Amino acid sequence: MARSRNRKNGAQFYELHCISCGKQVKETESSTRCPVCHRPLDVRYDYDYIRSRLNRYSLRTSPVKALKYLDFYPLLNLDLVVSMDEGGTPLYRCTRLAERTGVRHLYIKNEGANPTGVFKDRGSLVELTKAKEQGAKAVCVASTGNMAASVAAYASIAGLPCYVLVPEGTAIGKMAQALSYGARLIQVRGTYTDAARLAEEVSDRHGFYLAGDYAFRVEGQKSQAFEIIEQLDWQAPAAVIVPMGCGTNMAALWKGFKEFYELGFTERLPRMIGVQPDGCSPIVAAFQQGADQVSAVEKPFTVCTAVAAGDPVDGLKALAAMRESGGCGVIMTDAEILEGQQQLAHLESIFVEPAGAIPIASLAPLLTTGRIRPDEVVVCLATGNGLKDPKAALRVLPSPATIEPTIAEVDKFLKLRLYEIRAAAAKDGGRGLFSQVPSQQTVSKTVREELGVKLTADYAHRVTALVGDFVRKGKGITKADLQYIVENVLKASSEHRPILQVEDFQVTTSLKGKAEAKVWITFDGERVTSNASG
C-alpha cells in the first residue's frame, strides 16, 4: 500500500499558487506557470500539519542529506521517491581564502559534491518523483547544461525517457554527461530562452512532463539552506552569496532559511546576496535599478554558461529574496570570475565551474562597500564542479611546457622556473606593456616582473626580437601577448634530435629515357641510400 502523506480529511498538505495573481492551480493542470497570467507558481504548505508530523529529534541527530527533509517536500507517495543520495555536501571553512580576502569566517558550500556534480540534483529528486506520481511517460527539459545532466541521470533511475534541449555550444562536459545517462539531446541554434520556449511547446504537444526551473524544483533545492544551518551548529550565517541564472536557486535558499526560521530551528535570517556576470545580469540590474520587473537580456555572452539565462523564469522570486532579506546584488566581469576560480583552487583546492566562482570574485567589492563585514559569517555557494567546463579554466592557465625526455631538459625547466609562468590573468591580460621597440634589458625585466621567469641572455634575445617584430608591424604588446611569445620561444628552444636528414641527392634525366634519382639520407642515425626511376 502506498505511503500517502495527505491530511486525515484527504486534502493535500500543500497548494500551488501563482506568485502574481494568487490563483490556486491544481498540479494536474500545471506545475510550471499560472494558466491565467503565465507567471511562476509557488508551493504553499500547511505548516501546522508539517509541525504535527515533524520528528525534531531525528531531524537534529540524523546524518545531513537531502532525503532527511522529506517532510518539507510536496511529495504524496514516498514509495515513488527517485533519489541518488544527493545532498549532504561539505561546508568548508576556508581559512587561507579568508586570510587573502579579509573575510575571517568564510565558508564554501561545495555543491559540486552532488551525484552529477551540481546543486540541481536536489531539485531533480523532487521533480522526477513528481513525474512518477503523475504517471509521466517521458520527461522534457531545457538547460544550459547542468540541469540537462541532472534530469537525465534521475530520469534514467526513474526509467523514463528524457528529452533535453540545450543552446548550441553548451559545454561539452555537460552534454557528455547527459548523453551518457541516455538523454535524447538536441542542440538549439539560439539562446537558453529559445530552448526553454521550445521545451514547453514539445511538452504540451507530446504530453511529456516538463522539468526545469519551476515550483517543484525550488522545493528540492531549498535543502541547501537546511544543511547550511545544521552544519553551522543550527545557526544561520550573516550572509549567503548565490550565483544566479534563472533565479530559482536564490528563491529556493531563501525559502529554506525562512522555513527553518519559522519552525524555530534558527533565530535569525541571513542576507541574500545575488551575483551575476556582466554578460548576463538581468536580475541584479533590476535590483540595482529598483525595478519591479526583470528585463530580458537578448543575447547573453559570458564564460559562466551555467547562469546564462537571459530571461530568468524566477527573476521575480530572486528579487523578492534579495529585498526581503536586506541583501543586495553584485555584477562581476568574466575576468574577475576566472581569477576567483583560480584563487579558490590554489588556496583551498576546490575546483568549481565559472558560475560557482562568482561569489568568490564578489567578496572584494562587497567588503569595500560594507555590504559584508570582516567579522561576519559568510557562506558562498559553489554551485558546480569545475570538471563540468574545464575549457573555461584553461583560458587563464599557461600552456604546459613540452620537453624532450632528457634530464637536461628537466634541468632547464627547473633552472628557468618555467613552472612560475602564470597565464596573463584575464583581468589584466589586455594591459599594454610595449608600444615601442624595447631593449633586451627592458624585455628581460618585464618578463621577470610580469611572468615570474628569469630568461637567459639567449632566450631574452629571441623574445626581444619577436616583440620588436610585433611592435614594428603596429601591434602593441599586451601581457597576454608577452606570455604567448615567451611560451613559444621556450618551446621552440627545446632540445630536438633530428630523426630524418637528407644528406645529398642526384637526379639524371635524358630526352628519351626515364629519369633516374638517387638520394642519401640519415634516418635515426643510420645512413640509407635509395634509388628510383620514373
Where are these regions (language model features)?
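PLP-dependent amino-acid enzyme catalytic core
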Residues: A2-A425
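Terminal or standalone catalytic/regulatory effector modules within metabolic enzymes
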Residues: I421, A425-G534
